[in-house]
Amino acid sequence: MHIVCLTFDFDGISGFMSRGQVGPSWLSRGEFGPRVGAPRLIDLFRKFDIQTTWYVPGHTIESFPEAVKNVIDAGHELAHHGWTHRPPASLSAEDEERELIRANESIKKISGQYARGYRSPSWDLSPHSVKFFLKHGFTYDSSMMGDDYTPYYARQNDVIELEKPAAFGNETPLVEMPIHWSTDDSPHYEFVRAETSLRQGLKNAHHVEQNWVDDFHYMRETVEWGVLTYTCHPFISGRGHRIMVLERMIQQLKNDGAVFMRVDQAVEAFKRRQPQV
């Protein structure tokens, strides 16, 4: 079986706010997601009868509740993406856990249940993250890059010192659903001009489509069973030509035998196939 998980980091305006980009023009870019991009994507997935996973910051849930409710009502998974969209590695242990709890309460308030899955803003966990996920009942994370097509059980308590060999910690029950920047729409598409840097983005969407389809073909040719996770953002991939490319890609992958699942469903399929010893 070759599984595809389409995932969406539903940042709203929180990603810009977390970087101090709070002017009206910056925030309008994020607002496009709940106002325009998300409804388009929900309609697209209804057309193909597939379910996806949306990682949503608490700030987005509290600021755009109707947009988030529409995601839930369409049958998609609502998962955790922090509260302020600040990466855990930038927070103290106390603030990291506080944000984890606060956002999970927002998720329960709107959906009726706590999140099972977590994805770090900016894919930057702290040394404490896995411990907190286990403590608060998460079954999976999707923030690390230790594989491409095979989920694995995350470790904790690694000891990493510059001039010593790595001392790897113990395996935990937390399933890691690996991701990578090459299958994230943001570095390919998003134009970001800051005071001291410029990320051009705005790549040809057809080239991105071909790369992403090729990643699936490689999985199909090299592993008997695997999961490929694509990461998108409603304010990025919800625009004209990009959503057309996404539609074509879904059709191509379906034709090529892809089985589309929510991430929580793929986690359960992995655990059945490879139960922890």
Name the predicted role of every residue range.
Residues 1-77, 252-254:
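Active-site beta->alpha N-cap acidic-glycine motif
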Residues 1-4, 48-52, 74-77, 111-116, ...:
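Short, well-ordered coil/turn segments that N-cap beta-strands
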Residues 9, 45, 78-81, 118, ...:
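Conserved, mostly hydrophobic/aromatic
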Residues 30-35, 53-65, 86-96, 119-128, ...:
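Acidic-and-aromatic substrate-binding clefts and catalytic sites of carbohydrate-active enzymes
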Residues 38-42, 65-69, 97-104, 130, ...:
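Generic structural signal for well-ordered alpha-helices
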Residues 47-48, 202-277:
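C-terminal domain-boundary segment and adjacent tail
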Residues 62, 75-134:
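Long, hydrophobic, well-ordered secondary-structure blocks that form the structural core
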Residues 108-109, 113-224:
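Active-site-adjacent pocket scaffolds in enzyme catalytic domains
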